[in-house]
Amino acid sequence: MKNKTTVRLAGQEHTIVSTDTPEHIQRIAAYVDRRMGEISQTARLTPNMAAVLTAMNLADDLLKAQDENSRLRRELMSIRSGQA
């Protein structure tokens, strides 16, 4: 079932339609808003530029986490195969 959730990002309200719970959407929005605020504090940026830089930073974090996950899976497989 799709839920409509209103969130506030960079002082603007947005309605998000998702199958996720409203609580989960609010959690995501709070995280994104906090990251946008951190980026906006370091430089004078338009809201659009702050959103772009936030997206780039979050994508960087995601890709690094995926790389680390892959590395740990390989390490675990190596350990398991050594025990067989």
Predicted ranges, named:
Residues 2, 15, 23-31, 41-42, ...:
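Helical coiled-coil/dimerization "stalks"
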Residues 11-27, 33-57:
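Amphipathic, hydrophobic secondary-structure cores in small proteins
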Residues 43, 63-66:
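Residues at alpha-helix boundaries and short interhelical turns
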Residues 48, 54, 58-61, 68, ...:
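Heptad-repeat coiled-coil/leucine-zipper oligomerization helices
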